[in-house]
């Protein structure tokens, strides 16, 4: 799902906060290696399906110990095969001129079990190649296929999501454009999540997390981004997006939806939504704590992990199916449809 520019919905010109870099570099960030041969990757005919991959597959584009195969999604993501081990990876390709901006978030961020990071980085004369461990689908697809997730399962997954976001915020990364698709499963049982695509994150150099960028996914954008304010809190905007994600996981639909963008943005600005019946009191409380119109009233990411819903046993509660039958309200299939639809101390900050 692509993010959509929202500058037209505000009276303020869109200004992206420039990335600034300092010496706070993570020693565990993969070392950037240079490669000599660099053919342009492209589609290759008659490639076998992923399940049939083996080291004997005819090469498409050779890059050091890797073979780049066909595109996976978008214009810069490819399947890749590590020839010595036969292990399949995902390779993201960028212009070499963008290397500093692409790698800066990973250099800043210490390793975390719920944040994906490149296993290897190769730099050619024109292109940058980042290799990631293969994943097993994204959370958006799971929610759509099941039209919502029972509370116990949702709590286990959302705890991982909040942990990843809290880790990023602690180390000065504002994620922006948070959505279910950015959380992917690292195991085939689909119980462990990692946050991917840190390339677009803003790297902050101090406590001020003000942003001017009006670029976001319509379904997940916070009301303050749609307002005429010249800037907004990046961390609070990320928390709003987490609230939208949690609501969608439990209800199987977005809290704010309309086929007309102007009407959708109006609903988001008003900040009124109807919680589905059947949710536990603590789940309803957490959603309301995240989807507050006033950014300063929302939980901070670390505070989410302290909320009772993530600490109690909600195994006896599951969202009703009756609220998920309206086809115009379910999570849409594919990025095009989704884009169109689109009191304890320390809890607050």
Swiss-Prot record:
Gene Ontology CC: nucleoplasm; nucleus
Location of region: Disordered: 35-57, 317-349
UniProt feature, compositional bias: Acidic residues: 336-349
Annotated InterPro entries: Kinase-like_dom_sf, Prot_kinase_dom, Tribbles/Ser_Thr_kinase_40
Gene Ontology molecular-function annotations: ATP binding; enzyme binding; mitogen-activated protein kinase kinase binding; protein kinase binding; protein serine/threonine kinase inhibitor activity; transcription corepressor activity; ubiquitin ligase activator activity; ubiquitin protein ligase binding
Tissue: Detected only in the lung. Not detected in the heart, brain, spleen, liver, skeletal muscle, kidney and testis.
Protein kinase domain: residues covered: 63-310
Tree of life domain: Eukaryota
Location of the protein in the cell: Nucleus
Region of interest: Interaction with DDIT3/CHOP: 1-122
Keywords: Apoptosis, Nucleus, Protein kinase inhibitor, Transcription, Transcription regulation
GO terms of biological process kind: cellular response to insulin stimulus; intrinsic apoptotic signaling pathway in response to endoplasmic reticulum stress; negative regulation of DNA-templated transcription; negative regulation of fat cell differentiation; negative regulation of fatty acid biosynthetic process; negative regulation of insulin receptor signaling pathway; negative regulation of MAPK cascade; negative regulation of protein kinase activity
Induction: Expression induced during programmed cell death evoked in neuronal cells by NGF-depletion.
Family: Belongs to the protein kinase superfamily. CAMK Ser/Thr protein kinase family. Tribbles subfamily.
Function comment: Inactive protein kinase which acts as a regulator of the integrated stress response (ISR), a process for adaptation to various stress. Inhibits the transcriptional activity of DDIT3/CHOP and is involved in DDIT3/CHOP-dependent cell death during ER stress. May play a role in programmed neuronal cell death but does not appear to affect non-neuronal cells. Acts as a negative feedback regulator of the ATF4-dependent transcription during the ISR: while TRIB3 expression is promoted by ATF4, TRIB3 protein interacts with ATF4 and inhibits ATF4 transcription activity.
PANTHER family linked: SER/THR PROTEIN KINASE-TRB (PTHR22961), TRIBBLES HOMOLOG 3 (PTHR22961:SF14)
Comment on protein domains: The protein kinase domain is predicted to be catalytically inactive.
Self-association and partners: Interacts with AKT1, AKT2, MAP2K1 and MAP2K7. Interacts with ATF4. Interacts with DDIT3/CHOP and inhibits its interaction with EP300/P300. Interacts with APOBEC3C. Interacts (via N-terminus) with APOBEC3A. Interacts with RELA.
Name of the featured protein: Tribbles homolog 3
Record gene name: Trib3
